[in-house]
């Protein structure tokens, strides 16, 4: 009987009909559904991972740190072997990730670097410093700062994102590296004097918080189409830009006299604002590109090989340099959004109606 069973197993193996190994489980933890870009990131990644044969556990944490921690704990309990995490607070996950490391689970920090945890194996993001320099250089060009003098300065205010998001160091840092020389020469002037990261931060990247701060600046500085001159507002991303735009519209600005407002993510409301002349530009980070890159990293980890990496010097999370892959950002504006967003299939024309 034993010989018969052995022969049957051997035959199954020879014909390729032996039972398949269990599929690798991948946990994907996104911060919130309230921002369009995280919905797209999560859905694109889940689609790509499922297509590659993985079991995907996609969770959104409603911008609640305790909820994200609990969701990751549940992923570990269910046997997820690889975690892809876009953190709410980059410094709040050390405890649960210590558990992941003990269980041999590999962690990929997604777009936001997870800080102070040696459980982070890799980081996948866009070149976030370049995002800031793109925004800064756009302002230099559109405000004609290289041909101005301090007798005819351009006037600007500054907004960046949440102080618990490590990325603002790169977004805001890149932009300010470009713009600081013009501020020092007096060619560019911030009337409020609020130019430090702490002064310009927006908790949770909140549209409402950005709108309230912009309204306060408008009141304090008497900005308006018939008031004190305001040429531009630097915004690190679109959710802040939307709040800024709301406040400027409320102050009476129209497409004919709207200050130059920057952004990031090419979210639908911001693209519509660009078309309407109420936002100048937004840095485009194609989530399909990043999702595909993460799938390659997950594949390599699952196969025990080295994931593709193109940066080993930039991102130190407090425990050492995290091997990273940086995708390339570009900017969209009213002149190129059709080729960038519609022709590429990222959006349909109906999405932007």
Where are the language model's segments positioned?
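A residue-level marker of the well-folded mature domains of exported/periplasmic proteins
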Residues: 20-353
């Amino acid at each position: 009987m034993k010989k018969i069973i052995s022969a049957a197993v051997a035959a199954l193996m020879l014909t390729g009909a032996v039972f398949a190994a269990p599929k690798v489980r991948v946990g994907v933890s996104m911060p919130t559904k309230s921002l369009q870009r995280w919905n797209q990131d999560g859905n694109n990644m889940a689609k790509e991972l499922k297509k590659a044969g993985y079991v995907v556990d996609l969770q959104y944490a409603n911008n609640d740190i305790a909820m994200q921690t609990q969701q990751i704990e549940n992923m570990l309990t269910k046997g997820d072997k690889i975690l892809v995490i876009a953190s709410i607070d980059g410094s709040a996950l050390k405890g649960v990730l210590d558990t992941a490391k003990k269980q041999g689970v590999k962690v990929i920090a997604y777009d936001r670097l997870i800080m102070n945890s040696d459980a982070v194996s890799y980081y996948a993001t866009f070149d976030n410093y370049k995002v800031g320099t793109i925004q800064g250089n756009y302002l230099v060009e559109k405000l004609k700062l290289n041909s101005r003098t301090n007798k005819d300065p351009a006037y600007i205010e500054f907004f960046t994102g949440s102080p618990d998001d490590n990325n603002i160091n790169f977004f805001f840092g890149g932009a300010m590296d470009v713009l600081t020389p013009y501020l020092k020469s007096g060619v560019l002037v911030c009337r409020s004097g609020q130019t430090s990261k702490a002064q310009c931060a927006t908790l949770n990247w909140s549209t409402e918080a950005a709108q309230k701060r912009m309204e306060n600046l408008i009141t304090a500085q008497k900005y308006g189409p018939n008031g004190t001159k305001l040429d531009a507002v630097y915004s690190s991303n679109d959710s802040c830009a939307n709040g800024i735009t709301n406040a400027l519209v409320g102050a009476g600005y129209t497409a004919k006299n709207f200050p130059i407002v920057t952004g990031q993510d090419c979210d639908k409301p911001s693209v519509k604002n660009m078309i309407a002349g109420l936002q100048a530009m937004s840095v485009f980070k194609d989530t399909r590109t990043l999702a595909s890159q993460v799938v390659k990293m997950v594949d390599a980890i699952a196969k025990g090989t080295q994931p593709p990496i193109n940066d080993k010097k930039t991102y130190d999370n407090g425990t050492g340099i995290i091997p990273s892959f940086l995708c390339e950002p570009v900017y969209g504006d009213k002149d190129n959004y059709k080729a960038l967003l519609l022709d590429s299939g990222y959006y349909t024309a109906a999405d932007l109606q």
